[in-house]
């Protein structure tokens, strides 16, 4: 990691941009295209470090993936012709790759070992291993909780599973394993979590039924899979940094085009509207993965908010930068029910509070979230992403509230999801 990045950007921010393709959808598109025999094309994928780890693994399994002018051309021999890997499958910093492939490789019955970087080695895997073992997967981790994960051939069975947490990664691991079961699987969710796996199964011709909090699979659904082309919308989690940047920087007027606004992911839009932020959606498309252009303008006197319940999984990855936004409200805001933040790249409850407090903001971490007081940038302490891409970008946005440059250690963590983040932010500064 680069030791230090000096962020020296001032407002107003003005202009029109696009953000990189959605990370969650890119992962799933690569996985499904690789399972389907034939040729699939993925347009405008995210080619950050996380998604490249997923690509690398499927190449080892025998899939040809070519990068060609903002698209991936995936040519697969089909899942039945995958190679048995003779080396550890390295997932890097990608929790999505690790957890979803734990389910998929268990279902395939391919003897393999999944292992990631130091950060992944600290992230709990028991929440995925428990349901997979109920499905008779032969999968073991260190202390039944940590990578490396050792997978051996097994025959997967269907289960009726009540989710313990609102986690799209856990749900998706179960769904990918269930593709190979001779019995149906039923999943009951606590709250609605992002549903990209379900929508993309359908896109690749895999039958699945989802209604309310219940999901039902079809026995041996993998036999229905067909190759398909997929257009990846812009990642709302990446757009979130520009949404907040425009809202808190005087004189700003920013438009972001082609952003995915799947209702299971669009919590930040709901939150900004509740806070009275000046945000408008237009050019909306409908379908399984709807998109829109989003215009955001500087908004003083934002209203405080309590973020809890079903709103939390709809905005889970955006909560660090939303916490920054809440420091600019006229009263105290609260984030609750967000224990899931503890098992991200860092414990994002603690890292968000610690780093913003270093800069003079006033946040109190709680067991399941944050209490955020109206507060201002007071000191130019050196801060640290702690190798967490979303913390790094959140701190860069916070620097817009400072009249002096801000130093951020390990800033190149942002390459995990948004390799061109800083140049894009500077582009808006120059246009402003």
Swiss-Prot record:
Q: What keywords would UniProt list here?
A: Amino-acid biosynthesis, Aromatic amino acid biosynthesis, Cytoplasm, Transferase
Primary localisation category:
cytoplasm
Here the disulfide bonds are: none
Q: In which pathway does it act?
A: Metabolic intermediate biosynthesis; chorismate biosynthesis; chorismate from D-erythrose 4-phosphate and phosphoenolpyruvate: step 6/7
Q: Which GO terms describe its biological process?
A: amino acid biosynthetic process; aromatic amino acid family biosynthetic process; chorismate biosynthetic process
Positions annotated to bind 3-phosphoshikimate: 23-24, 28, 167, 169, 317, 344
Q: Name one Pfam family in it.
A: EPSP_synthase
Binding-site list for phosphoenolpyruvate: 23, 95, 123, 169, 348, 390
Which E.C. number(s) belong to this protein? 2.5.1.19
Top-level division of the source organism's lineage: Bacteria
Gene Ontology MF terms: 3-phosphoshikimate 1-carboxyvinyltransferase activity
Subcellular location per UniProt equals:
Cytoplasm
Q: Fill in the subunit field for this protein.
A: Monomer.
Q: What family does the database annotate?
A: Belongs to the EPSP synthase family.
UniProt protein name: 3-phosphoshikimate 1-carboxyvinyltransferase
Q: Whose protein is this, by species? A: Staphylococcus aureus (strain NCTC 8325 / PS 47)
Mind giving the lineage of the organism this protein is from?
Bacteria, Bacillati, Bacillota, Bacilli, Bacillales
Gene encoding this polypeptide?
aroA
